[in-house]
Amino acid sequence: MAAETATSKQNLVILGGSYAGLSTAHYLLRHVVPQLPGKESYQVILISASSEAMCRPACPRALISDDMFQQDKLFVSIPAQFEQYLKDTFKFIHGTVTSLDHQDRCVTVSVKDGDPEKIKCHAIVIATGASTASPLLGLNRDSETLRTNWNEFRAALPTAKHIVIAGGGPAGVETAGELGEYLNGRAGWFHSKLENPKVEITLVTADSKILPILRPALATKAEKLLNKVGVTVIKKSRVTNVTPPGAGAEDALTANATVTLEDGKELQADLYIPATGMTYNSSFVDASLLTDYGRVETDPGTLRVVNGGALLYAIGDVGSHARPAVHNILNTVPILCANMKRDLLLAVQPDASVGEDRQFKEDTRETQLVPVGRSKGVGAFMGFRQPGFMVWLIKGRDYWLWTTEGLWSGKHWAKGS
């Protein structure tokens, strides 16, 4: 049975230690807690299954070799990012949330290398994100596990002759492009495709085109770029079976696989990478608070959890308020924190003059940047098509690593908004 942690503090508890969780913690510590009456009574607690944060968008390239990125920038210690704050204002717990009681506002945590803890919360922010189908493409558990998976994949890569990737979204396209260029090189200027690639790489999508969020012309260009690094794209064909079961998952990461498509065609794979969709990390949340897809049902304007009671919020991929994307996370952090500040003030002074809620409105214009290999890519930003050079400059050169130092350290949130 979990022991309840005794504390005299009002705990503002954030569940999740990636873009949404760290950003929310920094914003609260910089711009919310200092403006609350009795500010000394509040403590921000961040709970994460990993003690390190990492630039998850970089996984399609990072999985190939440690030489692709400076490792001390790709992975950073979470506790180290918060040493700048007074000790009694912040606490980091390395563990996994196993249950959330939204009525009593408490969470139970399976602590890494420790006994389970039950924490009484004054406010809760659910920022646990989502897990990828492939254990190569995200922090599904912790950084140590991800590194172990990468090492196993890298050991199998030199002997692979056939690689199958399922999923035509950015993760699948980027992974195919990175592996294609690394293993096969790129076709010359006057060749539309790479003939006789060293490794046959096949990308399978159930959609009529890859990159469904982008306009058809950009999807077509991306497919041509994939062809130039030896990737064959199969469209309108869903993967219906993989043998052995679990191939590409953690327990059979590098197993040889037979991939069966819905038309009965079979593909033989020395390596199989499932890059289809995500599983939202919400198993600890009461089912009454979830959508049919497993996301936390979140008010699209205020970021409060629908039917969750007071002082319960969700942000990032796990929330239902917006399409999973880093730019949506960054746009919602100030709004969630402003509304939490309003709620915290009212909890102390019910008749306080706190103004109206701030409202988030998702920008649904075409926005997505997709590198295809080390120097090419396609994309659009706020509805405007971007040339390949801009895709490389903004994302493709290091997969956003140039932005993460400011986010992890909180410098990005130096000014409130």
UniProtKB/Swiss-Prot annotation:
Top-level taxon of origin: Eukaryota
EC number annotated for this UniProt entry: 1.-.-.-
Coiled-coil residue windows: none
Molecular function GO terms recorded: electron-transferring-flavoprotein dehydrogenase activity; flavin adenine dinucleotide binding
One annotated Gene Ontology cellular component of this protein: cytoplasm
Pfam families noted in UniProt: Pyr_redox_2 (PF07992)
Enzyme class (EC, first level): oxidoreductase
Reactions catalysed: deoxyherqueinone + NADPH + O2 + H(+) = herqueinone + NADP(+) + H2O
Keywords associated with the record: FAD, Flavoprotein, Oxidoreductase
Cofactor: 6-hydroxy-FAD
UniProt remark on cofactor binding: Binds 6-hydroxy-FAD non-covalently.
Family, similarity comment: Belongs to the FAD-dependent oxidoreductase family.
Annotated function: Oxidoreductase; part of the gene cluster that mediates the biosynthesis of phenalenones such as herqueinone, compounds that have been reported to treat tumors, bacterial infections and/or mycoses, and rheumatic diseases. The non-reducing polyketide synthase phnA synthesizes the heptaketide backbone and cyclizes it into the angular, hemiketal-containing naphtho-gamma-pyrone prephenalenone. The product template (PT) domain of phnA catalyzes only the C4-C9 aldol condensation, which is unprecedented among known PT domains.
Entry protein name: Oxidoreductase phnG
Source species of the chain: Penicillium herquei
Gene from which this protein is expressed: phnG
